[in-house]
């Protein structure tokens, strides 16, 4: 099986939220999960809500993204809804904690949605961090 023949050192996801983990009272344009658990909606992570977030790598990524001039928030209590966990569910054979992961929320549901220009800048800053990490 092809899915069983690969290994990931780190998975970085760019995902939306559908008002299951983030709400109008605090809806950032971008948010990096320093610690995260699955919200359990749509049964993704319902039985095991643990996501293997690499805290040191996530904090390093936040610092480097900020250094690149992209404003990003971070969360030590991210509740990852199906917009974030569905990808991990299928990629990691239902084991959300199978590989070290960094979850990045891109607000695509609540006004004011970040511009395409800002979103591309975020992706560029993340890629620069991964290519030239210390």
Regions found by a protein language model. Name each.
Residues 1-134:
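Active-site histidine-anchored catalytic micro-motif
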